[in-house]
A protein has these predicted regions:
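Phosphodiester-processing cores and adjacent nucleic acid-binding clamps
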Residues: 1-210
């Protein structure tokens, strides 16, 4: 290990233990590399899960036994929506509208406006795939317990389609001991910026306040 400490802690990193298509290396490899280059702590934030937690925890115990002063930060990069109830409601409305249009077209009902089937499929797919990224970090034991509960709930049928999701209500329920950060370009702040940038800086600021 280098004797020079680096005044930087990475709070957003993926491992092949939980983000196989978006990572290089297992948690222990990340931790060793960080320590050997002067790092004193590192967060692991895999996509939608904490599958790397046991790797991270056990390797930390090994490092500790070897006299290496290093702090693992447990976390996740969650898939976030403001309201899962509204998301589900929008999906159900689009799905029912598409079914109704198809039924009216088949029955030859006069005056029926038939939507393009491909456009309907795109609309449904767009809603179903909707999510933002949000980095959540464990602050203490209470936070770790709450993080496990939050992630477990995100995989419930009503919250899951291709991706496990959390919303404001769930975050409020399990907020104690958890720190939230804005993640990446897929995060809510960056998303609001790109969606409103052509409207000017005030529109961007207002969207971010919301």
């Amino acid at each position: 290990m280098t004797d020079k400490k680096i005044p930087f802690v990475g709070l957003h990193a993926h491992s092949v233990a939980g983000s196989i298509f978006d990572a290089i290396g297992y948690p222990d490899e990340h931790m060793d590399f960080c320590y050997e280059n002067g790092g004193e702590a590192l967060a692991l934030t895999d996509h939608g899960n904490m599958n790397g937690f046991s790797h991270q925890f056990l390797h930390w115990k090994k490092m500790k036994a070897e006299g290496k002063d290093f702090k693992p930060i447990f976390g996740v990069e969650a898939y976030f929506l403001p309201s899962i109830e509204e998301w589900r409601g929008e999906y159900n409305r689009i799905k029912e509208d598409a079914k109704l249009a198809k039924s009216l077209a088949k029955s030859g009902t006069s005056g029926a406006t038939v939507e393009d089937e491909e456009e309907s499929k795109k609309a449904i797919k767009s809603v179903l795939n909707r999510r933002r990224h949000l980095v959540l970090l464990v602050q203490n034991q209470t936070g770790l317990n709450n993080m496990f509960k939050l992630i477990s709930e995100s995989y419930n049928e009503e919250n899951y389609y291709r991706y496990p999701r959390v919303d404001y209500a769930m975050l409020d329920k399990y907020s104690e001991g958890i720190i939230a950060a804005s993640a990446c370009l897929g995060g809510p702040y960056a998303g609001n910026y790109w969606a409103n940038r052509e409207e000017g800086p005030e529109a961007v600021r207002e969207a971010m306040r919301e």
